[in-house]
Structures are given as C-alpha cells and as structure tokens.
C-alpha cells in the first residue's frame, strides 16, 4: 500500500473543500483531525500518558510540541501510533519500537523524528497548495469514486489513480481506525463536516483586535510572511520578528508580548499559544523563559517570553533557526490563517507571494497612507 494511502484513512470522510479549512467560514469545530481549542485545554497529554502509557511520559513534551506546531490533534497522532506499532498499550516495549512508533508511516528514525514527520505529513495533506497567476490558493484532486474528498493523492509521485482494491482497503482502514480511536479515548472520531458555503471574502479579525507581538513603543524587524513550516505559499500565516543579536546575546530584556487577551497554552518550553475571542489564536515559537502555564489568563501586550538566545532552546524539539527571533502565527478555529488582509497594530498586511517573499509588490504593510516592505515597524 502506498504511503499516502496509509495516511489517507485518517481523512477518508472529509466532506469539505480544502479552502474551507483555511478560511474557517464555519462557526464551530465538529471533527477530530485539527487540534481544537477544546482539546487543547481539556485533554491533558501528560496525565493521559501517566495513566495509560507511562513508558511514553518522557515524550510528553514532544507530543505536545508537534501537535501544537502542526495543529494536528494529539489524540489522532496517538491513535495512529497504537494502530501502527501498539506502543501505547504494550506492557514491555522494545527499544526498536520506540525508534519507529509510526512504523511505515515514516522513514525517519527516533520517536521525536517520526512524530514530527507524520504530524507534518498530515498537515500537508490538509493544506494542499497550488499557484494560479501568482496567487496561492487551495486545490483538491478528486477521484470521483471517493465521494466528496478533497485530498492530495500524489504525495509519492507514482500514480494519481486508485484501484478498487485500494479503495476497499482504505474503507476498512477507516473503520478500524475509528474503532481504535473510540477504544483509546472513549469518544467518537468525527470527520470534517461541510458547512454552508460562504463565497464572500474571508472573515477578518477587526482592525484593532491584534497588536504586534512586542511591547508598545518598541520597534522590531519584521520579515516576509511565510507558512508555518516555512515552505510553500499558502496559507502565509506567519511572521518572523526580532530585535537583533546572535546566539549567546542577551535577550532577557527583550520581551515577546501577547497580541490580544486570552487563555494561555504552553505547548513546550519554546512554543506557546494564546486563544483569543471569536475563534482566533496566535502562536509564539523559538522562546525561552515562558511566563505562564496552560490555562492562565493573559492580557493584551502582557509579557509572554524572551526570544531564545541559544539554538538548542530555540529549537527545543527540533526544527531550524538562524538566530534569536520570534516566529509568530495566526490561527482561526485551530487552522492556520492566511495573513493577507489581516491587521496588526493598525497595519494592514498584504501577502500574495510565497514564503519569505520580500518583493514589495507582493509583501507590504500599510497604515494611514503609509506603506513599507520587510523592515522595522512600531505600533
């Protein structure tokens, strides 16, 4: 069975266009794939592992970090581990199994490496991308025999079609996964449900709702918009911001601030999220000295953390970084949100290019008749 097939049974009953995932034109989450805010605050990963799989407790932060970073449900990922290797319920675990918890779903070695890889693959299957006349938009390649699916079918670049046997096997995998998910978490696995289509413009947070994620009165450098992973061109949900300085520099007087008031989620020692009103949230990555615990209420402009001043801390669970900065992202109902048209501290963002594109025709900020490209900005 192709690697894509092995992952697709998680997505088999998706009945919405991929674009709807990005723009979030529906009012509530009624599915299990995306890491919802309800799950974020009501499913305690560490407590679950302590009760059900204590041998995996050393990996609690890895699970929390990459679930938060990919915005894929940790329950889905844990169920995948159990389906592929039985690692959650094994009483005695061989070292080789800990190295390959997802089995053939990943060709990486190591628990953290496979967890990150599979979380990223699932996210990429949701956020399928294409370019049309230089503007990124979601697309779906639909096999008519797979009713209602909008999924990328060509991850292994071998064949776009499906045989009847493959479709039957995928349906069996779906049933098996659904039963396993219920057995592990005592709740149903709920696929995406299509909501009434809204062809109007994207819902936007009102001007004034979000501020730059640094203290009022300060000026930070802002680079080109990019996807959360840093590759591709949609959704351009993220910005890198910094006050300068290299590894080892003093960052203890440099503060990352909350873009709006909300409830705090500490995903790991270097990654946090604040859930705001009306389905919005903002994430903050490459941090040290995080000031709050999960569940805390924070105010707009309040201190979140310092930019990490060592590469090891900035990448506390892996990834890439070239120096102290914060990686800031916007989400809507748990999904990464395209920044084009969004406002930060009254500045309207235009982002119609690709990741890290600093061409002034494709990425710029404008406010009260002023506009600028990548560079230093203040509130």
Short names for language-model regions:
Residues 206-210, 250, 299, 320-379:
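Acidic, glycine-rich catalytic/binding loops that coordinate metals and/or anionic ligands
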Residues 202-205, 209, 220-258:
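Short glycine/threonine/proline-enriched tight-turn/helix- or strand-capping micro-motif at secondary-structure
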Residues 64, 68-88, 118:
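Short, functionally critical alpha-helical segments immediately adjacent to catalytic or ligand/cofactor-binding
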Residues 222, 256, 262-264, 295-308:
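A structural signal for short beta-strand/turn segments enriched in small hydrophobics and glycine
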Residues 20-28, 105-223, 356-379:
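Non-catalytic cell-wall polysaccharide-engagement segments
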Residues 5-15:
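Bacterial N-terminal signal peptides
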Residues 250-291, 310-325:
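Zn2+-dependent peptidoglycan hydrolase active-site motif and core
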Residues 19-62:
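N-terminal export signals and maturation junctions of secreted/periplasmic proteins
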């Amino acid at each position: 069975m192709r690697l894509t097939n092995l992952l697709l049974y998680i997505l088999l009953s998706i009945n919405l266009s991929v674009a709807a995932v990005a723009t979030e034109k529906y009012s509530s989450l009624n599915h299990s794939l995306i890491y919802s805010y309800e799950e974020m605050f009501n499913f305690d990963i560490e407590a679950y592992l302590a009760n059900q799989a204590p041998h995996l407790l050393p990996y609690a932060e890895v699970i929390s970090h990459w679930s938060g970073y990919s915005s894929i449900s940790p329950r889905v990922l844990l169920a995948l581990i159990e389906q592929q290797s039985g690692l959650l319920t094994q009483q005695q675990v061989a070292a080789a199994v800990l190295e390959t918890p997802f089995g053939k779903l990943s060709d990486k070695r190591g628990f953290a490496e496979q967890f990150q890889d599979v979380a990223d693959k699932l996210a990429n299957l949701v956020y399928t991308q294409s370019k049309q006349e230089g503007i990124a938009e979601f697309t779906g390649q639909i096999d008519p025999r797979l009713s209602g699916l909008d999924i990328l079918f060509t991850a292994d670049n071998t064949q776009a079609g499906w045989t009847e046997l493959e479709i039957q096997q995928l349906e069996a995998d779906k049933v098996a996964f659904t039963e396993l998910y219920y057995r592990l978490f005592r709740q149903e696995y709920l696929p995406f449900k299509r909501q009434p289509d809204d062809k109007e413009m994207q819902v936007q947070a009102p001007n004034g709702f979000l501020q730059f994620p640094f203290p009022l009165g300060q000026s930070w450098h802002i680079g080109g918009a990019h996807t959360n992973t840093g590759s591709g061109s949609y959704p351009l949900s993220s910005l890198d911001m910094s006050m300068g300085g290299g590894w080892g520099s003093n960052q203890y007087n440099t503060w990352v601030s909350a873009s709006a008031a909300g409830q705090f989620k500490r995903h790991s020692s270097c990654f946090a999220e604040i859930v705001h009103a009306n389905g919005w949230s903002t994430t903050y990555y490459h941090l040290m000295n995080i000031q709050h615990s999960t569940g805390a209420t924070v105010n707009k402009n309040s201190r979140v953390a310092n930019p990490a001043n060592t590469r090891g801390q900035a990448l506390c669970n892996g990834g890439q970084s070239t120096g102290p900065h914060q990686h800031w992202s916007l989400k809507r109902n748990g999904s990464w949100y395209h920044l084009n048209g969004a406002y930060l501290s009254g500045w309207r963002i235009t982002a119609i290019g690709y990741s890290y594109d600093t061409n002034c025709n494709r990425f710029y900020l404008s406010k009260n008749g002023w506009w600028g490209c990548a560079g230093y900005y203040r509130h």
